[in-house]
């Protein structure tokens, strides 16, 4: 669903020939996809576990305090 909306927004931005709008939506889509990726990595805690949440990824991968890097144009 995220990929479909990203393609739709890309076509809409290309038709309008407005690059700032395209970059805004691209960053928004990338943020959503990273959040979904990180949320799928969370393991449900077991009864024997003392911690609240266990994560497969390092904390820097799911840190939402900073904007994710856009590697599409590098």
Curated annotation (Swiss-Prot):
Q: Which residues cross the membrane?
A: 7-26
Indicate how the chain sits in the lipid bilayer.
Answer: Single-pass membrane protein
Q: Which domain of life is it from?
A: Eukaryota
**GO CC terms, sorted:** membrane
Keywords from UniProt, A to Z, are: Membrane, Transmembrane, Transmembrane helix
Q: What is the first-listed, main subcellular location in coarse terms?
A: membrane
Entry's localization field:
Membrane
Query: What's the protein name?
Result: Putative uncharacterized protein GAFA-1
Species of origin: Homo sapiens
Chain's gene name: GAFA1
